[in-house]
Amino acid sequence: MKLEYNRIIDSTLLKADTLPHEIDALCADAHKYQFYAVCVNPSYVRYAKNILKGTGVKLCTVVGFPLGQTTQRQKVYETKIAIKEGADEIDMVMNIAEFKKRCACVISEIRAVKKVCGKRTLKVIIETALLNQDEIRDAVNVCIDGNADFVKTSTGFSMRGASLEDITIMREASGNLIKIKASGGVQTAQQFLDFFNAGVSRIGTSNAVKIMEELHKLESHEHR
């Protein structure tokens, strides 16, 4: 099993009815497989942080999620609380309506949240399902101008998740100035491998264990 596979996974659990025992399992699996991070809703940051102590697994949470329709001030406040409670990484939803109006406030919003993050990783979700190809390119550049560390495809709560076409456009637009995270609807090992081979730096999925098991089976089959 290639080490890179598990180390680019954000194992994600963001559903509204998540219970503590599910967070327990998420964190235990992340420790077992040494996923790069787990991503949980803000209400579970403190809880998950305690479980992850000493595991080497990073803790990610979301801001302005899932619509992005909160103000810059609110996103900054959410980020401050998340970091105070133990978040290592922030996945923030871009204000898509303001972006479509070509408002410079979108760049300033990203910069403001990144300033709070400091050395912590900021990923900006652009929700590619709601953008055309030119808008995807522009959104990548907005994230670069905003000093984000990653541009991320999707929340997983819109019409669709990541596509290989999205990733191709984002890679071309990025000029290697920003990393790319694919997320939303990544359910199988083949999808995972497609995104991995397309050059993404991180993959978010709520099917991380299933994908790892499938990858192990594929590897075993290849070595027969």
UniProtKB/Swiss-Prot annotation:
Cellular component aspect of the GO annotation: cytoplasm
Entries under Pfam families matching the protein: DeoC
GO biological process, one term: deoxyribonucleotide catabolic process
Keywords: Cytoplasm, Lyase, Schiff base
Catalysis performed (reactions): 2-deoxy-D-ribose 5-phosphate = D-glyceraldehyde 3-phosphate + acetaldehyde
Disulfide bonds: none
GO molecular function list: deoxyribose-phosphate aldolase activity
Pathway: Carbohydrate degradation; 2-deoxy-D-ribose 1-phosphate degradation; D-glyceraldehyde 3-phosphate and acetaldehyde from 2-deoxy-alpha-D-ribose 1-phosphate: step 2/2
Main location: cytoplasm
Active site (record annotation): D91, K152, K181
Family recorded in the similarity comment: Belongs to the DeoC/FbaB aldolase family. DeoC type 1 subfamily.
Protein name: Deoxyribose-phosphate aldolase
Lineage of source species: Bacteria, Bacillati, Mycoplasmatota, Mycoplasmoidales, Mycoplasmoidaceae
Gene designation per UniProt: deoC
